[in-house]
Amino acid sequence: MAMLLQVALPLLAAVSWGWELNENDDSLAKIIEGCEWTSRQNVISEILLDRYRKYAMYNFFLLDDVCAVHEWNKNLKEPEFSENNEAEDKSPTSAQNTQEHIPGNNFPPPAASNPPVNSSCAKSAKDFFICLSNQLGDPTLNAMLLDNLEVACDPRFSPVSAIQKRNSKYVSKQKFYSWGGKRNNPNVFYPWGGKRNTGRVHRQPKVVIRNPFHAWGGKRNQKDDNVF
């Protein structure tokens, strides 16, 4: 199965490259003809390799449980250390399992580092990802897969999270507008997003100072007939 994959996939990539080369004959032909023979081989290899990576990534994302690979990779980056794990690490059996496999050593290699059998490569997305990593060893392909997994499976990149960020239930009312002006009613909303129905209890009553002049300029007369 592995030999069939290694032979069939490059052939498919070469056939697709040939079809696209006929369609885009002018652009690719100018690039290839302007190079020397060794450089020409490198250009063709880069084009085939890029299309093979896209083909492998397309088939990988056809699987149903691709987000399980994202969770598995995230747990590998952020291991959880607990008292039970520390106790297991101190035990002689765990020390024996974590020992590196050296030729001539009596201890078998760890089971987690063993690549899955070819028959199990298509059982799950995790096994398929491990098969691609072990058989191809292409760090660029692995980075492409992990980056696209983060965009597809991480809730921070989902459109639902963008809608929630704009909801007043999740975001408190800002005191300033985006253009820099200050809002007139900064206390209309609670910090958790709810709207205030009444004013604050501790707010002092508004004191109105009477203007001694009318709007038209004349002086006001008080009840005791004192003229200002």
UniProtKB/Swiss-Prot annotation:
Residues 1-18 form the signal peptide. It comes from the Eukaryota. Stimulates both fluid secretion by the Malpighian tubules and hindgut contractions. Depolarize the transepithelial voltage of the Malpighian tubules in concentrations of less than 10(-9) M and increase the frequency of hindgut contractions at concentrations above 10(-8) M. It comes from Aedes aegypti (Yellowfever mosquito). It is found in: Secreted. Residues 19-164, 197-209, 221-228 form a propeptide. This is Leucokinins. Residues 80-118 are annotated as: Disordered. One of its GO terms (biological process) is neuropeptide signaling pathway. The modification Glycine amide is found at residues 180, 193, 217. GO terms for cellular component: extracellular region. Keywords: Amidation, Cleavage on pair of basic residues, Neuropeptide, Secreted, Signal.
